[in-house]
A protein has these predicted regions:
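C-terminal transmembrane bundle
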Residues: 316, 328-478
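A gly/Pro-rich, aromatic-decorated transmembrane alpha-helix motif that marks the paired
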Residues: 39, 77-84, 111-112, 174-189, ...
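Interfacial helix-cap and linker-helix signal at transmembrane-aqueous boundaries
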Residues: 45-46, 85-89, 117, 182-191, ...
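Central cavity-lining transmembrane alpha-helices of secondary-active solute carriers
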Residues: 66-87, 174-179, 313-328, 422-425
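Helix-loop boundary and gating motifs at the non-cytosolic
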Residues: 14-73, 271, 280-293
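Conserved MFS/SLC helix-loop-helix module at the cytosolic interface between two early adjacent transmembrane helices
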Residues: 79-102, 108
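C-terminal ends and interior cores of transmembrane alpha-helices
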Residues: 96-125, 348-370
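Intracellular loop-helix junctions on the cytosolic face of multi-pass helical membrane proteins
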Residues: 1-25, 155-162, 166, 171, ...
């Protein structure tokens, strides 16, 4: 057997694996690129999309939401192929590296929309091609990146796994926080407040910051591409620090999948998916319908008029607050009265998420009546939505990882991503269905949000009935199986993503 210059099993150490900083750095830059692009996609399609002649050719909100959620659904469906390539053919490292290059190409296609090339190629074609490439890139690496974190750990340092998953989650939210503030600002025209801080920086600085060239689609879509290139470089630099779990080969892989035991494991892990998918059908709308709603609200807060696509920045802020609060205070307190299994956390999160959409529906009722409510009400809805996310997303992710046999980690992780894909496809289907030929929609205003409230409540009730019947096992990278209770003692992990 040929020797490899890379580690193929976790080293027997009790400290942090040496490859972790590269993985976390890669994830922070990649999440900056994705969430930056993601934050402006809906608003770009509804406000700034042009045709080849340079005329405004925007999409109606329902159509833009359908496009957006179809893109996200495709992105989260493709990881199944990345998982097979990673586990059976090439290994996780090479799949992440090469598909990251496709990812960069997708960002480049979106950046071309703001260049003279858009006068020769229809911008909607560039948009579609770019989104397809990004879906392939982001989707292909998703089952590999978070499992690559787990692959770095063995029995001797497994106690650090949850801590690293928390840092991993922190890097996601740090990247998304910065990008969702900056990238929308680069897309929208900017005029400095004559009495503000920027106006006192000098004419040359103010002129640069107000330049139409700076605030353009090619810059707004191009900067995320630069960060994706940085993420790819950081990942390459860490290649000799990582544990490279060898691919098992297609024959072994097929044998592992197509047997009775693995079939039962996959079916068990799929149990939460139909319920969690509805959570994602609601959560992902903070990038679509919530942004469109914010356009009709008074966005003055703390002396600043925020852009509608910047309001979602509060989500990573609340996540960074709620993660330690839930993990170190709320959960230990509640454990004194009731056993908090992962599935119970998920069930509670489903009910909480329904409450967030009820708040948004009440906001929309005021807008429909002609009022212009303060954006602080949507911020409160984000507080509730983020609480639901904290309960559902990281718990389900780590749950999925620990339930996967050693040779099938990436494939089992796809069940988590499948829930996101199906949830977005559900929302896309709703938005396609409600469009009438005359341009009107069947679910208008508050009725649209209330529809999702009732769907989420029904899902949550059904989940509380079904979840007690779940039986499963916990697996780690250097163990064949850990026999335990029906549910593993998992804590916080990481959202890929949304």
């Amino acid at each position: 057997m040929a020797k490899t210059p890379y580690l193929t099993t976790p080293p027997k150490i009790t400290t942090m694996p040496p490859g972790v900083p590269y993985i976390v750095g890669n994830e922070a830059a990649e999440r900056f690129s994705y969430y930056g692009m993601n934050s402006i996609l809906t608003i770009f399609m509804t406000k700034y999309l042009l045709d080849r002649m340079g005329h405004l050719s925007t999409m109606p909100p329902a159509n833009a939401e359908a496009w957006y959620h179809t893109f996200v659904s495709t992105l989260y469906f493709l990881p199944i192929f990345g998982a097979v390539l990673a586990d059976a053919v090439f290994g996780k490292f090479w799949v992440v590296f090469w598909i990251s290059i496709v990812y960069c190409a997708g960002h480049a296609m979106l950046a071309l929309i703001g260049t003279p090339i858009a006068h020769t190629i229809e911008p909607r074609y560039l948009l579609a091609i770019g989104l397809i490439l990004i879906a392939i890139g982001a989707g292909g690496i998703k089952p590999c990146v978070s499992t690559n974190v787990g692959d770095q750990f063995g029995e001797s340092n497994k106690h650090l796994l949850t801590r690293v998953f928390n840092w991993f989650y922190f890097s996601i939210n740090a990247g998304s926080f910065i990008s969702t503030l900056l990238i929308p600002w680069l897309l929208e025209p900017y005029q400095a407040d004559p009495n503000g801080f920027i106006a006192r920086l000098g004419p040359s600085v103010v002129g640069f910051l107000q330049s139409p060239r700076l605030h353009s689609a090619d810059i707004a879509f191009g900067l995320p591409g630069v960060f994706m290139a940085i993420a790819t470089l950081v990942f390459w630099l860490g290649r000799k620090k990582f544990v490279h779990i060898p691919p098992v080969g297609l024959k072994t892989y097929a044998r592992e999948i197509f047997n009775k035991q693995t079939g039962k494991i996959i079916l068990n892990v799929l149990m939460p998916v139909p319920f969690v998918m509805i959570f994602w059908a609601l959560w992902q709308q903070n990038f679509s319908s919530w942004i469109i709603q914010a356009e009709s609200m008074d966005r003055h807060l703390f002396g600043i008029e925020w852009l509608s696509s910047q309001i979602q920045t509060v989500n990573p802020i609340f996540i960074l607050i709620m993660l330690p609060v839930f993990s170190y205070w709320l959960y230990p307190f509640l454990e004194k009265f009731v056993r908090l299994t992962p599935l119970r956390k998920i069930g509670a999160g489903l009910f909480v998420t329904a409450a967030s959409f009820f708040i948004v529906a009440m906001i929309q009722t005021r807008i429909d009546a002609g009022a212009r409510p303060s954006i602080i009400w949507q911020v409160w809805a984000f507080v509730v939505l983020t609480a639901g996310e904290t309960l559902v997303s990281p718990t389900h992710l780590e749950f999925s990882y620990t339930q996967g046999p050693v040779k099938l980690k990436s494939l089992i992780m796809c069940t988590y991503l499948l829930a996101i894909s199906l949830g977005n496809q559900f929302t896309a289907a709703v938005n396609f269905f409600i469009q009438n030929p005359d341009g009107s929609v069947k679910l208008q205003g508050a009725s649209y949000f209330m529809f999702f409230v009732w769907v989420m409540l029904g899902t949550a009730v059904l989940f509380t009935i079904v979840s007690p019947f779940y039986k499963g096992r916990t697996y780690l990278q250097d163990q064949t199986r850990v026999t335990g209770d029906a549910e593993p003692g998992v804590g916080f992990a990481v959202q890929p993503e949304a």
